[in-house]
């Protein structure tokens, strides 16, 4: 699952989601992760079940999947790595969407990208 888990973001699953896995979805990631993880529960206090195989994958996020190109930072000496992490998830009731902001590396810098879902599991990177 990873050694550097961070960036948890929890939502109450909207009523318009068909066949939800639970009443709450908790999104998180390993900072060197290749996908955003998700756990679900019917109560905020759990028990939580980790959804496998995860939700948004690095290759679907529009971030590079290998370095370079993400290691092109001028003067950079530390190793860089392709990743997707730090999900920040919001329910857009007005649009019937679940919106996820994530960060990753591209051309040597950290960037934030957006992904959209109607079910909280299958996200489309933008």
Q: Where do the PLM segments sit?
A:
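Beta-rich carbohydrate-recognition and catalytic domains
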Residues: 1-85, 90-126
